[in-house]
From Swiss-Prot, chain A:
Top-level EC class: lyase
Record lineage: Eukaryota, Metazoa, Chordata, Craniata, Vertebrata
N-acetylalanine PTM sites in chain numbering: 2
UniProt-annotated catalytic positions: 176, 183
Protein name from the UniProt record: Very-long-chain (3R)-3-hydroxyacyl-CoA dehydratase 2
Compartments in which it is found: Endoplasmic reticulum membrane
Organism annotation: Bos taurus (Bovine)
GO molecular function: 3-hydroxyacyl-CoA dehydratase activity; enzyme binding; very-long-chain (3R)-3-hydroxyacyl-CoA dehydratase activity
Catalytic activity of the protein: a very-long-chain (3R)-3-hydroxyacyl-CoA = a very-long-chain (2E)-enoyl-CoA + H2O; (3R)-hydroxyhexadecanoyl-CoA = (2E)-hexadecenoyl-CoA + H2O; (3R)-hydroxyoctadecanoyl-CoA = (2E)-octadecenoyl-CoA + H2O; (3R)-hydroxyeicosanoyl-CoA = (2E)-eicosenoyl-CoA + H2O
Region (May be involved in interaction with TECR): 198-214
Length: 254, 308
């Protein structure tokens, strides 16, 4: 879901043409854009994020070449992954203060779900860090984010290469299911360790008269993918048809 | 004579939906809505939004056709507000749920706690007291809905009832589960804490009721007039000097009292969520008071004296 939501719901981080987001029609209307200082900040933000995820991508490749296998590559990119994915929390702020026209709620869900997977699952349950499923979602996220942040960078500069737009609205077809599979398998792998350690769980009796079963909570999270993922996926397919055919028509008249 | 004509177009498609030929100049929007329903019975008046501009504000039922800036043929744009349900129905359902649900947990109905606890009773006084307070609170709300409140809108969208009931019923079940649990832990400071909390709760319930009565008396039956509320002889209403929506202030106070009484985290969370929502409503109400009344008392804050 974190992978899916990131592509589907995010329409922000500035930029003009051809943006797609949950419920937003692609428009060629000239919107009153952000001021020059804001645009500069957003460009810097998106460039830094693009660079960050490139660092993660390069880190993965180098680690693979050095180790000779694709297992346990998580450890080589753990720090930049945590840093740049957590940094995406700023995007919620961008929406809240209005410099980016996306919905705060939608952006929050997408970023929080990523941050949840990084910290509350992968970081917290050390035993899953060597699972192959982690590599699955890390690769999906890395490719998605490199494309997404460069898309925003170019949009802000009003020079969006068709290739980037195409990539953003096409690669998700594979990256989405890949990311979702990685996420679900990782959560599933974490379950027995959560149960064993009673991780983040509190039981009765206690003086706050409250209980929380993290194991049950994780299962609920997994179940929530069932209604959410198809909706996000088919929304993106719909957006793709609208945006890529729209561009085709424009090209015809050039 | 030149009797006005009214054409109604769909606000989104601009399709001509209805043409009303001889309309009385003194006709109100409400009457036009009734005429429109005759040709389109699936759109009963409560779900019609008629406006002069497709993107403009909805016209009010009381607006008179002649007084609107229209020519001899008035063009009105129609938007379907979706299935509507009356406010009274929604309130009654939202409040009856928690009343009933809490009692299921209080009486430890089977399948909630272990079998050996079925239909047993808690040995803690505070648990019985909490049940009385919670039940009183919702009975009060039901009675106020039936006999006290004067609603300015008749209806709200149907989907609201599902959203609202999930919220009220869900939280009621969640807090009731812990308070009535066999492993419930009574408050750390014992009877002192419970007495203090009960006092807060009772005072705030009385306060909340006083405000509801004062607001009711502000508006005559059947009317939709709005006036600035002022303190009355009832000391509980003196909070009007400091806040625009003291009913919300007292409501938050009641739940804080209940949270202290039960020392139950879910109750505290429910209070927090409720406080957040009521603050949003209070700020909105405060803003519309300021917009509508030039002479609105400047000292007043929306919900918390001097602060918020």
């Amino acid at each position: 879901m974190a992978a899916a939501a990131a592509i589907a719901a995010s329409k922000g981080n500035g930029g003009g043409g051809g943006r797609a987001g949950a419920g937003e029609a692609s428009s060629s209307r000239r919107k009153k854009g952000p001021g020059p200082l804001t645009t500069a900040y957003l460009v810097i933000y998106n460039v830094v994020m693009t660079a960050g995820w490139l660092v993660i991508a390069v880190g993965l490749v180098r680690a693979y070449l050095a180790k000779g296998s694709y297992h346990s590559l998580y450890y080589s990119i753990e720090k930049p992954l945590k840093f740049f994915q957590t940094g995406a929390l700023l995007e919620i702020l961008h929406c809240a203060i209005g410099i980016v026209p996306s919905s705060v709620v939608l952006t929050s869900i997408q970023v929080m779900s990523r941050v949840f997977l990084i910290w509350a699952v992968t970081h917290s349950v050390k035993e899953v860090q060597s699972e192959d499923s982690v590599l699955l979602f890390v690769i999906a996220w890395t490719i998605t984010e490199i494309i997404r942040y460069s898309f925003y960078t170019f949009s802000l500069l009003n020079h969006l290469p068709y290739l980037i737009k195409w990539a953003r609205y096409t690669l998700f077809i594979v990256l989405y299911p890949m990311g979702v599979s990685g996420e679900l398998l990782t959560i599933y792998a974490a379950l027995p360790f959560v149960r064993q350690a009673g991780l983040y769980s509190i039981s009765l009796p206690n003086k706050y008269n409250f209980s929380f079963d993290y194991y049950a909570f994780l299962i609920l999270i997994m179940i929530s993918y069932i209604p959410l993922f198809p909706q996000l996926y088919f929304h993106m397919i719909h957006q793709r048809r609208k945006i890529l055919s729209h561009t085709e028509e424009h090209k015809k008249f050039e | 004579g030149r009797q006005p004509r009214v054409e109604i177009l769909d606000a989104k498609t601009r399709e001509k939906l209805c043409f009303l030929d001889k309309v009385e100049p003194q006709a109100t929007i409400a009457e036009i809505k009734n005429l429109f329903t005759k040709t389109h019975p699936q759109w009963y008046p409560a779900r019609q939004s008629l406006r002069l501009d497709p993107k403009g504000k909805s016209l009010k039922d009381e607006d008179v056709l002649q007084k609107l800036p229209v020519g001899t043929t008035a063009t009105l744009y129609f938007r379907d507000l979706g299935a509507q349900i009356s406010w009274v129905t929604v309130f009654l359902t939202e409040y009856a749920g928690p009343l009933f649900i809490y009692l299921l947990f209080y009486f430890r109905v089977p399948f909630i706690y272990g079998r050996k606890y079925d239909f047993t009773s808690s040995r803690h006084t505070v648990v019985h007291l909490a049940c009385i307070c919670h039940s009183f609170h919702y009975i009060k709300r039901l009675l106020e809905t039936l006999f006290v409140h004067r609603f300015s809108h008749g209806t709200m969208p149907l989907r609201n009832i599902f959203k609202n009931c999930t919220y009220y019923w869900g939280f009621a079940a969640w807090m009731a589960y812990y308070i009535n649990h066999p492993l419930y832990t009574p408050p750390t400071y014992g009877a002192q804490q419970v007495k203090l909390a009960l006092a807060i709760f009772v005072i705030c319930q009385l306060g909340n009721f006083s405000i509801h009565m004062a607001l009711r008396d502000l508006r005559p039956a059947g009317s939709k007039t709005r006036k600035i509320p002022y303190p009355t002889r009832n000391p509980f209403t003196w909070l009007f000097l400091l806040v625009s929506c003291p009913n919300y202030t007292y409501e938050v106070g009641s739940w804080i009292g209940f949270a202290i009484m039960t020392q139950c985290l879910p109750v505290a969370l429910f209070s927090l969520v409720g406080f957040t929502q009521m603050t949003i409503w209070a700020k909105g109400k405060h803003r519309s008071y300021l917009k509508e009344f030039r002479d609105y008392p400047p000292l007043r804050m929306p919900i918390i004296p001097f602060l918020l």
